Amino acid sequence: STLSSSSAASDVYKRQLLNRTVDKAEAIAQAVNAHFNNDKVIPMNIADYADIPGEDYVVIQTTSVGLHPNDEAVVIDDEAFYKKAAVGVDIIYNPANTKFMKLIKAQGKNAYNGLKMLLYQGVSAYELWNDCKITKEEADEVYKCLQKELGIDE
């Protein structure tokens, strides 16, 4: 719901929120729309993904589907869905290149994992707890260490 909330404040586009349980999608969309006093988040059943209007949309995969050791699992396995995407972000970082990301990349699009999100959540917490600021250079060094530790070669 955080991703929905942060994107819902913008006046540019509507967002389709797909969930395997339509009731959950409706509840999240209602809460986000009420918070921002708009109707930018549209709840949808994940089975209706082909009904997403337009093309060149950003897809953010926020489930645990595809998380190690289930590396080859994916929520939507239809190439047509990925053809319409402009870019994909998978919150998972292990494996570093999920099946979701592979399907996005197979269409010649960019795909990103959740490692930087994990890093910057940690940086924010560290700064808050220790009343300090971490430089971009320091964060970049930690990112490189995380990549090395996880065997990620980007």
Language-model features, listed with the residues they occupy:
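Small/polar loops that bind or transfer phosphate-bearing groups
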Residues: 5, 17-20, 88-92, 113-114
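Single conserved hydrophobic/aromatic residue that forms the stacking wall/gate
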Residues: 1-9, 13
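Rossmann-like adenosine-cofactor binding region
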Residues: 38-111
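Adenosine-phosphate binding glycine-rich loop
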Residues: 91-154
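Short, charged, surface-exposed secondary-structure boundary motifs
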Residues: 25-28, 70, 121-124
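Active-site-proximal catalytic alpha-helix in oxidoreductases
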Residues: 10, 57-62, 118-127
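NAD(P)-binding Rossmann-fold cofactor-contacting core
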Residues: 14-36
